[in-house]
Each structure stands twice: as C-alpha cells, then as structure tokens.
C-alpha cells in the first residue's frame, strides 16, 4: 500500500520520468502483481526507470535493459538481445560430474518430463541446447567482462 501511495505522490506533478529502486523487493506475490499492473498501465505515458535484481520483473516490465558494471554502462539493449548473448551456451545435462569444461550451474530444469541440470558453458557440449533467458544472457555478459 505504501508503495502505491509513493507512486501516486510521484505522479502528481505529471513527470516525464519515474525512477524506481527495487520496487518489488519484500512484496508478497499479490502486491507484487498489483504493482506490476500499475507500472504496465503508466509506462506508456512516461519513461519508467526500474533498478532491480529480480530478473522476472525486468522480463515482464522492461522494453530495454541497461547493465551497469563498476558504475559504468556496459550494455543498453532489448531483453531479447541480452538473452541472445547466451544463445548456443545454455544446455541441459544429466550430470555435471563428468564435465571437463568450465560451466556455470543455473539449477534444475525439466525438459520433456525429464529432470536435468541447466548449465551455461562457453564450450559446445553434446547435450540438449536450451532457449536462453534474460538471466542466462546476463550471466554470460557479466562473465565476459570479468
């Protein structure tokens, strides 16, 4: 409720830009959904700048993503373009125990009803390739920089 009131106060002066810092952190699922619906309704009328670490918020609310690294802008593009950074690098493997190549574990995933481990690997693998997400692209992008 406080966040909705804060947004309402910010909109009183009919601004061109609305800055939001971690706006959904700590919200329960229902309030988070309500908040996202408010943002969707107003984002056509003004520029909404959203600072968040919650990737699902970015995917559902943002048209473009700006990535900061050490205080510098390192990327500014669409969600799809950031996801494409990981294209051909995201795989579903049965086990990571025998992998000789470095990889980044992204957790469990189910493909065609079978459980796998989702990984990101710079080296091509003989495993089912997965469609990359914005989070996968972000991980690949950041690892390129470091």
Feature names for model-found ranges:
Residues 29-31:
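Helix N-cap at the start of a conserved alpha-helix in ABC-type nucleotide-binding domains
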Residues 106-146:
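C-terminal coupling/interaction segments
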């Amino acid at each position: 409720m406080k966040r909705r009131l804060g947004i309402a106060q910010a909109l009183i002066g009919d601004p061109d830009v609305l800055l939001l810092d971690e706006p959904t952190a700590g919200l329960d699922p229902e309030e988070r959904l309500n908040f996202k619906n408010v943002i969707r309704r107003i984002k056509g009328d003004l520029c909404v700048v959203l600072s968040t670490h919650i990737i699902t918020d970015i995917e559902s609310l943002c048209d473009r993503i700006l990535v900061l690294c050490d205080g510098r802008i390192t990327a500014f593009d669409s969600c799809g373009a950031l996801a494409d950074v990981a294209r051909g690098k995201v795989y579903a493997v049965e086990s990571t125990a025998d992998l000789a190549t470095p990889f980044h574990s992204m957790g469990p995933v189910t493909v065609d009803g079978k459980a796998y481990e989702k990984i990101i690997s710079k080296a091509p693998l003989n495993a089912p390739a997965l469609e990359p997400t914005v989070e996968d692209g972000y991980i690949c992008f950041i690892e390129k920089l470091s």
